[in-house]
Curated annotation (Swiss-Prot):
It catalyses: (S)-4-amino-5-oxopentanoate + tRNA(Glu) + NADP(+) = L-glutamyl-tRNA(Glu) + NADPH + H(+). Keywords: NADP, Oxidoreductase, Porphyrin biosynthesis. GO terms for biological process: protoporphyrinogen IX biosynthetic process from glutamate. InterPro entries: 4pyrrol_synth_GluRdtase, 4pyrrol_synth_GluRdtase_dimer, 4pyrrol_synth_GluRdtase_N, GluRdtase_CS, GluRdtase_N_sf, NAD(P)-bd_dom_sf, Shikm_DH/Glu-tRNA_Rdtase. It comes from Clostridium beijerinckii (strain ATCC 51743 / NCIMB 8052). Its EC number is 1.2.1.70. This is Glutamyl-tRNA reductase. The lineage of its organism: Bacteria, Bacillati, Bacillota, Clostridia, Eubacteriales. The gene is hemA. It is an enzyme of class 1 (oxidoreductase). During catalysis, the active site Cys acts as a nucleophile attacking the alpha-carbonyl group of tRNA-bound glutamate with the formation of a thioester intermediate between enzyme and glutamate, and the concomitant release of tRNA(Glu). The thioester intermediate is finally reduced by direct hydride transfer from NADPH, to form the product GSA.
Length: 401
């Protein structure tokens, strides 16, 4: 049975923190888990804790063992969900396609799932069923994003402002601040064909980290030398006061687009009154964000059929795998019948040509009926009637002579 144990989505942060998975203890975790489970993958990120497994234990017994291995307090069991079979692997396909991410359709989770799968491979914790499941889910996630073209709809403030600036044909930029948001802004900017970015920072040593000739790292004291030569400012500092003021900007000149991603604001209110400026603050950007989230959600639902196709294929593969022993037995029976019939004929005929012909005819006849029986079992298994038909076919073909 393929199953999944995970932390519920609405679990408060202070409770989520109690479900710690320590990366340094993976060797110990996998060692203990594989004593109880046939296969296991640990997916642990800052927003997600999920254990995928292949086992035959009952749910209560399984939960207790998992809690013991990870040293979790069983008192918090109510914050955990457990599901199995199709619901479990549907969840993984949805995770890889971005349906369960805080930012719908984001790419990061796909890399995290891939890392978790490769980690399990290193510890020899996956074999056939989870191996196939994770390969299919990762492939599905890649194809889903590509065909749904989610990249066309940015849903984070940093990606939105870059997208909006590029639409306005800006090519010369100034980015103020190089914290988490600033780094994302730079990443998105440098993925486009822009001309120049003046990166304004307090620590000029940051220039050693950036290997791109389009980037000029400058200090806040130097920013006013270049501020009137650019077309767009993106400000994302943590300063408690404005860092872009009216006196910094010349009243004459071409249009200047300014995006202020900071709270409190980086850009002085009066800057918006200048005739050449267009100023957008975090509230304006958030409205674009809300619209984009709805657009992205609609687009993802429109393309859910891509995920459902992979889900169906895996489900069918799993069902057919469950009857592999029956197929193997049928082929063995067919081969036994063929060999016995050929042996009987060989004793009755001395003509080598006749014996060779008999070999071919008996083999082809045996293969025809066995293969047809296998086709019927596969068809009926996928319809959900496999057990009944396996019983009938075994009665026909596997009766002792």
């Amino acid at each position: 049975m393929i199953g999944l144990i995970g932390i519920r989505k609405n679990t408060p942060l202070e409770i989520r923190e109690k479900f710690i998975v320590k990366s340094k203890k993976y060797n110990e975790y996998f060692g203990e888990l594989l004593k109880e489970l046939n296969e296991v993958v640990i997916l642990a990120t800052c927003n997600r804790t999920e254990i995928y497994f292949n086992a035959s234990l009952n749910e209560e017994e399984l939960l207790k063992k998992i809690f013991d291995i990870f040293n979790w307090d069983y008192e918090y069991k109510k914050y955990v969900f457990i599901t199995n079979n199709k619901d479990a692997y549907r969840h993984l396909f949805e995770v890889c396609s971005g349906f369960h991410s805080k930012i719908l359709g984001e790419d990061q989770i796909l890399g995290q799932v891939k890392d978790a799968y490769e980690e399990a491979l290193e510890f020899k914790a996956v074999s056939l069923e989870l191996h196939r499941l994770f390969q299919e889910a990762i492939t599905c996630g890649k194809r889903f994003r590509k065909e749904a073209k989610l990249f066309e709809i940015p849903v984070s403030s940093s990606s939105i402002v870059v997208s909006e600036a590029i639409k306005r044909e800006c090519t010369k930029f100034m980015v103020l601040g190089y914290g988490e948001v600033g780094q994302l802004v730079m990443k998105y900017l440098l993925s486009h064909k822009i001309q120049t970015v003046y990166l304004v920072v307090r620590n000029p040593k940051i220039k050693d980290e950036i290997q791109d000739e389009r980037v000029k790292v400058i200090t806040f004291e130097e920013k006013n030398k270049y501020i009137n030569s650019i077309e767009c400012i993106i400000s994302c500092t943590s300063a408690p006061h404005p860092v872009v003021k009216t006196e910094d900007i010349s009243e004459s000149g071409s249009r200047l687009v300014i995006y202020d991603l900071s709270v409190p604001r980086d850009v002085e209110k009066e800057v918006a009154l200048l005739s050449r400026t267009e100023v957008y603050n975090i509230d304006t950007i958030s409205r674009i964000d809300d619209e984009n989230k709805k657009l992205r959600k609609d687009k993802m639902e429109d393309n859910r059929h891509i995920m459902n196709k992979y889900l169906k294929e895996y489900d069918e593969w799993l069902k057919l795998r469950s009857i592999s022993h029956v197929i193997k037995n049928l082929k063995t029976v067919g081969n036994d019948v063929y060999e016995k019939r050929v042996q009987t004929f060989s004793h009755k005929s001395k003509d080598k040509n006749d014996i060779a012909l008999a070999h071919k005819l008996i083999k082809s006849t045996s293969d025809f009926y066995i293969n047809r029986a296998i086709e019927v079992i596969k068809e009926e298994t996928l319809k959900g009637c496999g057990e009944e038909w396996i019983g009938i076919i075994e009665k026909i073909f596997m009766t002792k002579e």
